[in-house]
C-alpha cells in the first residue's frame, strides 16, 4: 500500500487527515517512518500507540528519538488509562514505580496499576499514607477503598484524609473514611469547620450527627459546636 504513492503524496494525505493520521502512521513501519521526519516526537502519536497497545511502534519511537522524556510521558499516560501491559514492557525488572506514576493512576481510579506497582515493592503507605490523602482529595473512592484494604490508616497525618475530603465536598468519600476509622473530633472538629466554611452542608450535617453519636448531644453543644460556629 505504501509503495503505491510517493512519500510526498502520503505527507499531503496525512496532513489532510489531521488527528486521524496517527492511526495511519501505525499501519506499518513505512508509514511510521514518515512521522520520524519530525525532529520532535509528537505526543499524540505516543498516545495513539499506548491506546492501541502498539508496543513495537512505541519502542521504535523511544529508541529513535532517544529521549527519556518520551518514556516518562508514555509511562505516565499508561498509568492514567490503566494500560498495565505497556507499563510492563517499558520498565526494567527492578523498577518499583514512583509517586508521580501512582498519582496518575489515583487521579483516574486505575487501581490495577497501583496493584501492579505494589506487587513490585512500591510502599502504598509511603509518607504517612500520602496516597490515601491524595485519593481523598481527588475523590478517588475506588482507590481509597483499595488502599484501606491494603492497610492505609484513615487517621493518617492527623486525620488529613477526612479533612481533605470535607474541604472539597466529597460526601461519599467522607462517609467511607468515617466508617473506616477517621476521627470526626480530631483537631477540634476541623473537618466540620472546613466543610461549613466551604458550604458543604450535607457533610456538616453528617459529621455532626456522627459526633453526637460519639460524645452525646450535651457535650457536642457545649464543647464542639462553639469551636466552629
From Swiss-Prot:
Protein name: Putative ankyrin repeat protein L148
Keyword Repeat in record: yes
Pfam families tied to this protein: Ank_2
Swiss-Prot/TrEMBL ANK repeat ranges: 70-95, 96-126, 127-156, 157-186
Keywords associated with the record: ANK repeat, Repeat
The organism's taxonomic lineage, starting at the top: Viruses, Varidnaviria, Bamfordvirae, Nucleocytoviricota, Megaviricetes
Domain of life: Viruses
Amino acid at each position: 500500500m505504501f509503495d503505491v504513492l510517493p512519500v510526498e503524496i502520503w505527507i499531503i494525505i496525512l496532513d489532510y487527515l489531521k488527528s486521524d493520521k496517527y492511526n495511519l502512521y501505525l499501519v506499518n513501519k513505512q508509514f511510521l517512518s514518515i512521522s520520524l521526519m519530525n525532529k520532535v516526537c509528537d505526543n499524540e502519536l505516543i498516545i495513539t500507540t499506548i491506546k492501541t497497545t502498539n508496543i513495537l511502534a512505541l519502542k521504535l519511537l523511544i529508541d529513535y528519538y532517544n529521549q527519556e522524556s518520551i518514556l516518562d510521558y508514555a509511562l505516565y499516560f499508561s498509568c492514567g488509562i490503566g494500560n498495565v501491559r505497556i507499563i510492563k514492557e517499558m520498565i526494567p525488572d527492578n523498577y518499583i514505580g514512583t509517586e508521580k506514576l501512582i498519582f496518575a493512576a489515583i487521579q483516574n481510579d486505575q487501581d490495577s496499576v497501583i496493584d501492579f506497582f505494589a506487587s513490585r515493592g512500591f510502599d502504598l503507605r509511603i509518607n504517612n499514607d500520602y496516597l490515601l490523602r491524595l485519593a481523598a482529595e481527588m475523590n478517588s473512592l475506588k482507590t481509597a477503598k483499595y488502599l484501606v484494604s491494603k492497610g492505609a490508616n484513615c487517621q493518617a497525618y492527623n486525620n488529613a484524609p477526612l479533612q481533605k475530603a470535607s474541604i472539597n465536598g466529597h460526601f461519599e468519600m467522607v462517609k467511607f473514611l468515617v466508617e473506616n476509622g477517621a476521627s470526626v473530633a480530631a483537631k477540634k472538629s476541623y473537618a466540620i469547620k472546613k466543610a461549613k466554611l466551604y458550604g458543604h452542608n450535607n457533610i456538616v450535617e453528617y459529621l455532626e450527627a456522627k459526633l453526637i453519636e460519639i460524645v452525646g448531644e450535651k457535650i457536642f453543644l457545649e464543647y464542639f459546636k462553639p469551636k466552629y460556629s
